């Protein structure tokens, strides 16, 4: 199965951010905007896209999606662009058992711990900027930042996956699916009876 590593860069400001809101509230807010996405297929070249119609043209038929904090990137991938991979992978979830109480599970901390490279800081300069607000030079720097994040995530996955139990990967996938692609099963008979009760009470 092919591994598609992704990282979305999105608009945020001092009030509208993941530090102030839940992931779901942030993604469903009317202020949400994708600036761009970096995509790497297996160990191929990582590419940056600002046009989402072009971004997903070359996805393999049989693939899994890898990200660092897949709850966020995976939800954008599924909710906004209706893409459905066969499997979800998440380096943050993979790192938690070993690093949550020590190194921490940020991509920056883990990259430093495993000597994979350095995570950039360009995201700190993008606060309050819509895509239209970026100069070409700023957007180029942001693209390089995003591409680097994808490269670090893929390298981290290669480190963490050595000896990582398949059963645990399946638990991670199932846990992510409960958020990214939730399924609600309704009791039709109970709802019909409840509706009848409401109608009856209104008539009295």
Place the predicted regions along the sequence by residue:
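Active-site neighborhoods of enzyme catalytic cores
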Residues: 23
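Mixed-charge, glycine-rich, non-catalytic linkers/tails in nucleic-acid processing enzymes
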Residues: 85, 125-204
């Amino acid at each position: 199965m092919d591994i598609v590593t992704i990282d979305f860069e999105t608009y945020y400001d001092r009030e509208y951010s993941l530090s102030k809101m839940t992931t779901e509230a942030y993604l469903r807010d009317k202020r949400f905007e994708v600036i761009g996405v970096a995509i790497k297929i297996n160990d191929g070249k990582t590419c940056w896209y600002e046009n989402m119609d072009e971004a997903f043209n070359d996805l393999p038929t049989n693939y899994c999606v890898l990200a660092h904090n897949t709850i966020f990137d995976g939800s954008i991938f599924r909710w906004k662009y209706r893409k459905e991979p066969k499997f979800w992978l998440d380096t943050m979830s993979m790192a938690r058992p070993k690093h949550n109480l020590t190194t921490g599970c940020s991509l920056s901390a883990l990259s430093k711990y495993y000597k994979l490279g350095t995570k950039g800081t360009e995201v700190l300069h993008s606060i309050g900027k819509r895509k239209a607000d970026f100069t070409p030079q700023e957007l180029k720097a942001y693209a390089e930042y995003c591409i680097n994040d994808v490269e670090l995530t893929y390298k981290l996955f290669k480190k963490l996956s050595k000896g990582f139990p398949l059963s645990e990967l399946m638990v991670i996938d199932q846990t992510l699916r409960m958020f990214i692609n939730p399924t609600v099963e309704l009791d039709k008979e109970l709802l019909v009876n409840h509706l009848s009760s409401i109608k009856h009470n209104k008539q009295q």
